[in-house]
């Protein structure tokens, strides 16, 4: 794979930066809009019954620790649909980003990230660009080098302990951390592993990494021309990379 030179922001978009975008444009995020059943039902298996109208209200998924071990294939055990949760109220009604303006913005859909990037006269990176940026130009295993994860609690914000019920918080953060809280990689980029997931412009296609090597070098790949997730075949998805404060070796590693 070959890519042309490109610029990338030093850190994830903070609440302060996203607030500037909202103030300037009046943009309303996906999580702040009531759900249009006619729009969403085409992303679900045929025959899925319509939920009650009081469920189809503006909201987002909020993480809650479980009381003990659960099936890690069943994310409904720890992700809970919460009406009123959005970027200004990350944990739902009654929560606030006050005191967290330097934290990365959360509850941001692909459409929201794309809209912010356009407003800022930028764009989302391709997955290939993101991968190169995360590498820091090295062949190291992690953005911080080759130190194993258990010895890297001062290098990135991720889950220490047993997911999703025992977080030892050895890195000092049970949730998001302010941007630039941990050391940068060799390119000077922060949080290329951990803290929050980061959007790429590519469509998600499970077959993206299979290609005919006889074609030689692929220049500036920008992903598949189709959405392809056999687990949720009707849902259009885009690539996210980098992991988050909820990731550890047992989950999303």
Q: How would you label these PLM feature ranges?
A:
Residues 10, 15-22, 109-115, 131:
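Short, solvent-exposed alpha-helical surface patches in non-cytosolic proteins
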Residues 1-5:
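A short N-terminal beta-strand-loop micro-motif at the entrance of redox/enzyme domains
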Residues 6, 13, 245:
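Hydrophobic pocket-lining residues within nucleotide cofactor-binding pockets
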Residues 6, 21-30, 120-121:
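Short capping motifs at secondary-structure boundaries
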Residues 34-39, 43-253:
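Functional-site microenvironments in short loops/helix caps that host divalent-cation chemistry
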Residues 7-10, 76:
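Short secondary-structure transition/capping motifs
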Residues 11, 31-32:
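N-terminal segment of the mature folded domain
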